[in-house]
């Protein structure tokens, strides 16, 4: 099982993460240079196969469990991913699922949406008790916000959402993100 240290090294070594949201994106990811994939689609019948393809291609695979059809926001979903797939970790917006995943030996990414100043304030409070191995901030095209959040935590920051070109990647990394996730 991949450890936190190796995950952090992979984030630094491969700053662009493939955000896979459909079968076409999966095929593109399998032949890409990206070493990490965030699986943002699937259902309870095909998620193990999607993850297996990524693992066979040598990728680290993280399943966004909030987006898998047929699964609910309960601890049993984390147990299902841990026992029935070869995923390296999970992504979720839910603190309780991240905590449970840590207990199952999975790596974790907690996703936060920065919609307004209140959300930004709440992220600061939540990061103080967050157990995730990394934090994903959406949208990822706000260098000022990324800088503020990365300055308030020792957790690696991943910028995601609305990243559309090289300039967005460079700006996010320069602001303190260790990686970006993009389709």
Which residues does each predicted region cover?
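Conserved N-terminal beta1-alpha1 strand-loop-helix module at the mouth
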Residues: 1-65, 69-71, 86
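Conserved beta-strand positions in the central sheet of alpha/beta enzyme cores
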Residues: 17, 38, 62, 91, ...
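Short, acidic/polar
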Residues: 19-30, 74-80, 118-126, 165-169
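Glycine-rich beta-to-alpha transition loops that act as phosphate-gripper elements at the mouths
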Residues: 19-23, 67-72, 91-95, 113-116, ...
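Conserved, mostly hydrophobic/aromatic
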Residues: 29, 94, 135, 172
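Glycine-rich phosphate-binding active-site loops on the catalytic face of alpha/beta enzymes
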Residues: 39-43, 97, 139-145, 161-183
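Ordered, amphipathic secondary-structure segments that act as subunit-interaction surfaces
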Residues: 73-97
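Histidine/lysine/aspartate-rich catalytic loop segments that bind and position anionic ligands
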Residues: 95-126
